[in-house]
Amino acid sequence: MSSVKLFKDLLGNTETVELKNKKLFISDKKINHQEIFNSVLVEEANSRQSTASTLTKAEVRGGGRKPYKQKHTGRARQGSIRNPHYVGGGRAFGPSPEKNYTLKQNSKAYKLAFQSAMTLKLNEQGLNLLVNKIDMKEPSTKTISKMLKKVSYENKKVLFVINDKNENFLKSCKNIQKVTSKMWNQVSVRDILNSDIAVIQEDAFDKISEVFA
């Protein structure tokens, strides 16, 4: 399946075209679900903020003196009322804001994951193209909404990938639920998988193919 829907304008006029640039796609046998999983895991881990924090027994206020003498009380020996087993005591092995959740994935593995995700999107007929020339003199949410409604995409998660930083187009997509717009060099495997439909500008598609093929 190498034919895709091409948006000829922002009015929702489309035609079916044959993909000329196919070097980004791989055979079904080479699709690697494990690398797709790894790339999403890495992206989510790297976006995680280390904000959870607790106090250890050294940081909790109070408990400097020994609660009672060492011997001859019939009780277990204690050194501080701020030990972890006391109410109000410090936390043993608690979360720290210094913890680093960063993960890495080598570029070759990420390329395979990206190719696999794009191939899956093409196979499920979720890949569309958009002409390079976008005439938007001002932001217009209504224009994008009408376009999506005309092709029955209004209830689907749509990802627009554009070639140049067209502020009017990016702002037009912001207020529409389930619609995301990104520059070609910002799109990730997670973005592709998280969308039902990916609409990519022709030049953006060529640039993505150069980088990830």
From Swiss-Prot:
Protein's UniProt keywords contain Ribonucleoprotein: yes
GO biological process assignments: translation
Positions with biased composition (Basic residues): 63-75
Protein origin, superkingdom: Bacteria
Region (Disordered): 51-90
Record-linked InterPro entries: Ribosomal_uL4, Ribosomal_uL4-like, Ribosomal_uL4_dom_sf
GO function term, MF aspect, one: rRNA binding
UniProt keywords, alphabetically: Ribonucleoprotein, Ribosomal protein, RNA-binding, rRNA-binding
Entry GO terms, CC: ribonucleoprotein complex; ribosome
Pfam family, one: Ribosomal_L4
NCBIfam families xrefs: rplD_bact (TIGR03953)
Purpose of the protein: One of the primary rRNA binding proteins, this protein initially binds near the 5'-end of the 23S rRNA. It is important during the early stages of 50S assembly. It makes multiple contacts with different domains of the 23S rRNA in the assembled 50S subunit and ribosome. Forms part of the polypeptide exit tunnel.
HAMAP family registered for this protein in UniProt: Ribosomal_uL4_B
Stated family: Belongs to the universal ribosomal protein uL4 family.
The protein's assembly and partners: Part of the 50S ribosomal subunit.
The protein's name in its UniProt record: Large ribosomal subunit protein uL4
Organism field: Malacoplasma penetrans (strain HF-2) (Mycoplasma penetrans)
Taxonomic placement: Bacteria, Bacillati, Mycoplasmatota, Mycoplasmoidales, Mycoplasmoidaceae
Gene: rplD
